Amino acid sequence: MSRISIRFFNDREVRAVWDEANSKWWFSVLDVVGVLNAQDDYTKNRNYWKYLKTKLKKEGSQLVSATNQLKMTAADGKRYLTDVLDYNGVILLANSFPNARASRFVEWFTYSDETIDGRSKSKAYALFESSLIDNIEVGTVKGLKQIHGYLFGGLYDFAGQIRTKTISKGDFTFCLAEYLGRELQKIESMPEDTFDQIVAKYVEMNVAHPFMEGNGRSTRIWLDLILKKRLRKCVDWSRINKKEYLQAMQESVVNTAPIHRLLALALTDKINDRETFMKGIDYSYYYEQED
């Protein structure tokens, strides 16, 4: 199966397919058009691209000849041939749009892979595509440290290390550093035989927030590994809205019902489906993007 990547600009998807033979990504033209026009209507994006392609062809633009076609999954779940462009082609396309959004898009597009998140996401892809994932302890603090260490090794000097400082987010203070070791032992010993128990364990680990940074990205992988081992399930994160997820996680400190519901509705038995896990990584990192 093709390797799929999803990036997000202003909460809109930009999908890409990996070309193994040429070692590069091909990006969906219609996704880029939708982003640049701030338009979610598929038909309008398709018609605009048809118009623009004709215009560029008349002008003798290299962009049209650089366009390729690859299969991508549509809204109906089926795969269809769609126009795609490589990295340089996307920049050319963006530069043909006469609006301020295009310049911001180009800045985001050319910079996003070089950020800590961009480099960490590449490491997350590699983790799932290697045998290393099979060596991670499931449901333990050690396993979570292994995940964090792999995702952020070489990016943070505290990668894979339990924090020794107390941290807060907004008005909420996570587990005090002096009690964190004891709290993590309690969480590790929590049962994980049922879905309810697994969600409870996940919520408690989030409240503990054992690392200085990178907790959510690491803990979502940790959760999926528990679900896979215990229930032969995993979460299809692409089915969980970012705002709803973040709100549910905030509420989970006093009420776990919202996050329980979101996770339950997104459960899938596609535990060996490569695309499901790759999309999961994309969405997991998307949750952490600042609005």
Predicted regions and their residues:
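FIC/Doc superfamily catalytic core
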Residues: 95-291
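An anion-engaging/catalytic patch
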Residues: 1-112
